[in-house]
Amino acid sequence: MHFNLYLKNKFLLYAYGKYFWYLEYTNASQIIAAYEGDKLLGVIIVDMKNEAKPYKSFWKTCYIKLIDQIQKFFFKGGVMAYNQANKEMFEEYTEKYTPDGEIRFLAADPDTKLKGIGTMLLNEFERRKYGKEIYLFTDDQCSYPFYEHRGFERIGEKDIVLELDDKINL
């Protein structure tokens, strides 16, 4: 997600980025990271069905719930539309497929000179969970060809209009 397209306020951008990271991190059963020395190059976060979520945290969960409530109060048009679209697409997907897990997050440092970090992370995950049915949700800011080249199929698409209140300095 490119949150900076929706939020101008640096504090809100930081707070929402933290929320998003905690949400994905605490729902993960698998996290694979790529490093060069101490520098993080990329990460894949996956939630596999029937696997423990070892990264749960009381305080991170409290933070997530607080931001969820703030979103529902201020940004209900955007959040609810997004969640509803994902729910509908998932229901459509599960009519034909039985997923074993979801890729919740995949990112590589765009400033690194090393190429192929995302592919390496996906390959390592596939090695660990070979033959499993995996899905992901993404937005129009992603690289669809990246996923399609690696065997993913685009099953559903929905246009979502984010109704944000312009009275709030975002």
Regions found by a protein language model. Give the residues of each.
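Conserved beta-hairpin
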Residues: 29-44, 80, 109
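Conserved active-site alpha-helix within GNAT-family acetyltransferase domains
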Residues: 119-120, 140-163
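Conserved GNAT acetyl-CoA-binding A-motif
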Residues: 99-101, 128-141
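A conserved beta-strand-loop-helix scaffold within acyl/acetyltransferase catalytic domains
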Residues: 17-20, 46-53
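Conserved acetyl-CoA-binding loop-helix of GNAT-fold acetyltransferases
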Residues: 105-108, 114-127, 149
